[in-house]
């Protein structure tokens, strides 16, 4: 009997040791950052399926709910086809947002081995963090800890991109703030916008932003603010509908500044076709159809017929289907179901 019990403990001990080693590989091995992120991604998808099922019911399988869901599929398609050049808030679109870390000590504790073994809010050292309430560049958690930066920190489960972006960051595309920052000379040529493209040396920067906007006084800059509001209203973004309705008068003023005072129509069509326009057509800028048309063929006469910079014609070349382009578009615009809170 004693021998049998001893053998049992040996087997149990061996099983426990193997379990420990397997768990250690999962949380600290060479591929641990990817593994832990995949676990979080699966959990996120499960929560999304639950939300969609409660609202719409299940026609066939739970996973079928995700096939037509822009929030999940749009992000995946973006990561697969767009993130080699573009970013989405500095990552590939598939980052999992984690609980903020209020202090450096908290971030260090959450990234430790013990936390990764047992805690649900653990952070891998290879994931990314940055100061909260900023649009600063993401750094690896390890780099933040080594630099002893003061918190609080936003933290995401995502790997740091190997290469610098070669096209604009599309988080918030066509929102008021995104457009207003686009009209800032320094931001226009930054990596967040066109710093990695040939457009940084184009007429938009050289003849307008650098030559004119840098000399604008307060009144001129106020007109640019109104133009950003008016141009963003062209997108008809779902998350901005109430603000656009409330700011109808400001939008009308912005349209006037765009067409008259600032003279955007010297280079862009707006409201009606202009065969002599050098820049993209601003009519419906950022709207669902505008984005779809652009992704299908950026070299169309409405966009960049002569100076497209490496953007593939995803529709013309059949790289993406119409449905896939629509999913990416709706995801970028935030046009998808969200449960009421």
Where are each of the predicted segments found?
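Electrostatic cytochrome c docking/interface patches
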Residues: 46-78, 92-96, 133-137, 150-168, ...
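C-terminal capping alpha-helices of c-type cytochrome domains
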Residues: 122-155, 209-245, 250, 314-341
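Sequence context of c-type cytochrome heme-c attachment sites
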Residues: 34-72, 79, 87, 112, ...
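N-terminal export/targeting leaders of redox proteins
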Residues: 1-65, 143-152, 157, 215-231, ...
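Gly/Gly-Pro-rich "capping" loops immediately C-terminal to redox-active cysteine motifs
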Residues: 87-116, 126-129, 156-184, 190-212, ...
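The canonical Cys-X-X-Cys-His
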Residues: 74, 78-89, 107, 124, ...
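C-terminal substrate/ligand-recognition segments
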Residues: 2-29, 70-71, 75-86, 176, ...
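Sec-exported extracytoplasmic/periplasmic mature domains
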Residues: 83, 112-115, 119, 146-150, ...
């Amino acid at each position: 009997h004693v021998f049998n019990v001893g053998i049992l403990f040996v087997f149990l001990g061996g099983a426990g040791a193997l379990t420990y080693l397997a768990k250690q590989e999962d949380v600290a091995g060479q591929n641990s950052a990817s593994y832990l992120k995949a676990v979080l991604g699966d959990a996120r998808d499960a929560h999304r399926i639950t939300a969609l099922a409660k609202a719409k019911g299940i026609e066939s399988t739970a996973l079928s709910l995700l096939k037509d869901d822009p929030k999940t599929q749009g992000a995946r398609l973006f990561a697969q086809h767009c993130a080699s050049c573009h970013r989405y808030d500095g990552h590939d679109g598939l980052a999992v947002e984690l609980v903020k870390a209020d202090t450096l000590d908290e971030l260090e504790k959450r990234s430790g081995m013990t936390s990764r073994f047992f805690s649900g809010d653990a952070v891998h050292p290879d994931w990314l963090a940055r100061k909260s309430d900023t649009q600063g560049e993401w750094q690896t958690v390890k780099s933040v800890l080594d630099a002893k930066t003061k918190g609080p920190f936003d933290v995401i489960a995502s790997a740091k991109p190997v290469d610098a972006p070669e096209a604009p960051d599309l988080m918030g595309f066509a929102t008021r703030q995104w457009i207003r920052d686009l009209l800032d000379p320094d931001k226009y040529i930054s990596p967040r916008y066109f710093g990695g493209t040939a457009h940084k040396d184009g007429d938009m920067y050289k003849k307008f932003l650098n030559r004119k906007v840098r000399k604008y006084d307060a009144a001129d800059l106020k007109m640019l603010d109104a133009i950003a509001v008016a141009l963003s209203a062209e997108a008809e973004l779902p998350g901005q509908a109430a603000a656009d309705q409330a700011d109808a008068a400001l939008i009308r003023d912005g349209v006037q500044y765009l067409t008259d005072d600032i003279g955007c129509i010297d280079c862009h069509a707006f409201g009606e076709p202009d065969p002599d326009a050098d820049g993209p057509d601003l009519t419906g800028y950022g709207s669902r159809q505008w984005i779809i048309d652009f992704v299908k063929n950026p070299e169309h006469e409405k966009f960049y017929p002569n100076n497209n910079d490496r953007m593939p014609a995803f529709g013309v070349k059949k790289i993406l289907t119409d449905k896939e382009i629509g999913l990416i578009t709706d995801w970028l615009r935030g046009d998808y179901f969200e449960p009421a809170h």
